[in-house]
C-alpha cells in the first residue's frame, strides 16, 4: 500500500512539471498527426513523398542559408543545386522544413500545371499579401479571390492591343538612352543600370501620363522636366531598397513580420508619396479634362472607374513593379548573352537588316507592333533569355484545403503527393526551364535555334516565363513589345557589342521581386 502511494505521489509530482507536460503534449500531437496524415492520404489517394529532406536543424538553419546566398547572388542557382542531391533525383519534388513547418518544393511541369491551372482553386497566395502589402498595397499581385478578380477586371482593358502597340512612344526615351551609350564609347559601362532607368521612364509615362525622365541627367547635358516633383530624387533608390527587402520577407515565410525595419518603412513612405503626387493630380481633373487628354494614360483610365486614392495608388505600384523590372531584367539578360555570342548577334542583325535596315539605312517608321511580331529570330532570342532567366524565377502558393499534387509520391515518384491545408508549395520555373529531361543535354546553354525545333514547340507547362492559368501575366505583350523594340533599335544604331571574356559564367543573379544580374551588364558598345 505504501509502495503504491509513493508511486502515485511521484506521478502526481512529475505530471505537473512543464518539462514533462510539454514533451508529452508534443508526443501525443505527433501521434495523432501521424494517423491524421495517414487517413488524409488514404482518402485523397496520395502516397508518401518520394523525397523528404531535412537540414538537420528542424528547418531553422535553411532561412539563414538562403539569406546568405541572396546576399552573394547565388540564391537562384541554389534552387537547382538541391535537386540532383535528392535521394531520388529523377523525382523533382520534395518536402522540407523551414522553422519546423513542412513545405513542398517542385519543378515538375505537371505539378506546376496543377498549381496554376487545373487545381487553381485549391491554392492561394497565402502570406504574399502580408509580405508585399507595406510597399504595393492591395493590387493584382497581392490579392486573392474577389479582390483579385476585381483588380484583374479593372486592369485587363488597359493592356489591350491598342494600348501596348504604340511603340513610337518609346523612341524619345531610346534617343536619350543612345546618348548615354555614346558617351561611354571605348569604355566598359553597366547597360543594366541604364535599362532600369529607361524602363522607369517609359513605364511612368504609360502609367502617370508623364515620365520621371531619370535618364535625362547632367552627364549627357540634359535635365529632367520632373526634377521639381517632391520626392523624385529619392524615389528610385527607395523603390529598389523596398523591393530587395520584400524578397527577404518572402524567404522568412510566416515569420516575415520579423523584418520590418525603420529604413524599410521610410522607403515605403517615399514611394507612396511619389505615387500619391500623380494620383492627386489625376483626381483634380474633371471628367471633361479627362476626355480632352491626348493619347492614352493608364492612370486617367483608372480614374474613370474609381476615385479612391488608395486603390489608384496600389494598382499603379503593382503595375510599376512589373512594368519597370520585368522588361529591364529581360533586356539586361538579352544583351549579356548577345555580348557573349557574336554569332547570334550576326544572325539577329541579318533579320533586322532585312526587316528594318541598319545604321544610316534604318527604317524606324517600319518598326511596329505587327512587324516586330514577324521577327522570328528575335522572338527566339527573347524566348531563350526568358527560358534561362525568367523574370520571376521562383514563386509559391498555399493550399486552401487538403489536396494533392499529381506527382512526387511513392517509390517511382509518379503517385500523387498530399498537400495539407495551409501548407506552402514552392515552385521554381527557373529550374524547370533548365531540366535536361525536357530541354536536352544543352539545357543550360544559350541557343536560340532550339525554338525552331519541333520538340521545343510542344513544351506546355515546361515553359512558363509569364506564369500561367487564370493569373497569367496581363502585361506580357507589353514587356515583349518594349524589349523587342529596344533590342532592334540598339542593334540598328551600334555595330560593336563586347563583354569581358573573363567574366564569371553563369552570372550571379539578384532576386528582388524579379530577377536581374547581380554584377550588372558590363559591356562595351559603340
From Swiss-Prot:
TM spans, by residue? 18-38
According to the UniProt record, one GO cellular component term is: membrane
Q: What does the entry list as the binding residues for heme?
A: 473
- What name appears for this protein in its UniProt entry? Cytochrome P450 52A5
List the top taxonomic levels of the source: Eukaryota, Fungi, Dikarya, Ascomycota, Saccharomycotina
PANTHER family per the UniProt record, alphabetical = P450, PUTATIVE (EUROFUNG)-RELATED (PTHR24287:SF1)
CC cofactor: heme
Q: Where in the cell is it found?
A: Membrane
Amino acid at each position: 500500500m505504501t509502495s503504491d502511494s509513493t508511486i502515485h505521489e511521484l506521478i502526481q509530482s512529475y505530471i505537473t512539471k512543464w518539462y514533462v507536460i510539454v514533451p508529452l503534449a508534443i508526443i501525443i500531437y505527433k501521434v495523432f498527426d501521424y494517423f491524421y496524415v495517414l487517413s488524409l492520404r488514404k482518402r485523397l489517394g496520395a502516397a508518401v513523398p518520394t523525397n523528404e529532406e531535412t537540414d538537420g536543424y528542424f528547418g531553422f538553419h535553411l532561412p539563414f542559408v538562403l539569406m546568405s546566398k541572396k546576399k552573394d547572388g547565388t540564391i537562384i542557382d541554389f534552387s537547382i543545386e538541391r535537386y540532383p542531391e535528392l535521394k531520388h533525383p529523377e523525382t523533382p519534388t520534395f518536402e522540407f522544413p523551414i522553422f519546423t513547418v513542412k513545405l513542398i518544393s517542385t519543378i515538375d511541369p505537371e505539378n506546376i500545371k496543377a498549381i496554376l491551372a487545373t487545381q487553381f482553386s485549391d491554392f492561394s497566395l497565402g502570406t504574399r499579401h502580408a509580405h508585399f502589402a507595406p510597399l504595393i498595397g492591395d493590387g493584382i499581385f497581392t490579392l486573392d479571390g474577389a479582390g483579385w478578380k476585381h483588380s484583374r477586371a479593372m486592369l485587363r482593358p488597359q493592356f489591350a492591343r491598342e494600348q501596348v502597340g504604340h511603340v513610337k512612344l518609346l523612341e524619345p526615351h531610346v534617343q536619350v538612352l543612345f546618348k548615354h551609350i555614346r558617351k561611354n564609347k571605348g569604355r566598359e559601362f553597366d547597360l543594366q543600370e541604364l535599362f532600369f532607368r529607361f524602363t522607369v521612364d517609359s513605364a511612368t509615362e504609360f502609367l502617370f501620363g508623364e515620365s520621371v525622365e531619370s535618364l535625362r541627367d547632367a552627364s549627357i547635358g540634359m535635365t529632367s522636366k520632373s526634377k521639381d516633383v517632391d520626392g523624385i530624387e529619392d524615389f528610385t533608390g527607395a523603390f529598389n531598397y523596398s523591393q530587395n527587402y520584400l524578397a527577404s520577407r518572402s524567404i522568412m515565410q510566416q515569420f516575415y513580420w520579423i523584418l520590418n525595419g525603420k529604413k524599410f518603412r521610410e522607403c515605403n513612405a517615399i514611394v507612396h508619396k511619389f505615387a500619391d503626387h500623380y494620383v492627386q493630380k489625376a483626381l483634380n481633373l474633371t471628367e471633361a479634362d479627362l476626355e480632352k487628354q491626348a493619347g492614352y494614360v493608364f492612370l486617367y483610365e483608372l480614374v474613370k472607374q474609381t476615385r479612391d486614392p488608395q486603390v489608384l495608388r496600389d494598382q499603379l505600384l503593382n503595375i510599376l513593379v512589373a512594368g519597370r523590372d520585368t522588361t529591364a531584367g529581360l533586356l539586361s539578360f538579352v544583351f549579356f548573352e548577345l555580348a557573349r555570342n557574336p554569332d547570334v548577334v550576326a544572325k539577329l542583325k541579318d533579320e533586322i537588316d532585312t526587316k528594318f535596315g541598319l545604321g544610316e539605312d534604318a527604317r524606324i517608321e517600319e518598326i511596329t507592333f505587327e512587324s516586330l511580331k514577324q521577327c522570328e529570330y528575335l522572338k527566339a532570342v527573347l524566348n531563350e533569355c526568358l527560358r534561362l532567366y525568367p523574370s520571376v524565377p521562383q514563386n509559391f502558393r498555399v493550399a486552401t484545403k487538403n489536396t494533392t499534387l499529381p506527382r512526387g509520391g511513392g517509390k517511382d515518384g509518379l503517385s500523387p503527393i498530399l498537400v495539407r491545408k495551409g501548407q506552402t508549395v514552392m515552385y521554381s520555373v527557373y529550374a524547370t526551364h533548365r531540366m535536361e529531361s525536357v530541354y536536352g543535354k544543352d539545357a543550360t546553354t544559350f541557343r536560340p535555334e532550339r525554338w525552331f525545333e519541333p520538340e521545343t514547340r510542344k513544351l506546355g507547362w515546361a515553359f512558363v516565363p509569364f506564369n500561367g492559368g487564370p493569373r497569367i501575366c496581363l502585361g506580357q505583350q507589353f514587356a515583349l513589345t518594349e524589349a523587342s523594340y529596344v533590342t532592334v533599335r540598339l542593334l540598328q544604331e551600334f555595330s560593336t557589342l563586347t563583354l569581358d571574356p573573363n567574366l564569371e559564367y553563369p552570372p550571379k543573379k539578384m532576386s528582388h521581386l524579379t530577377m536581374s544580374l547581380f554584377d550588372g551588364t558590363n559591356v562595351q558598345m559603340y
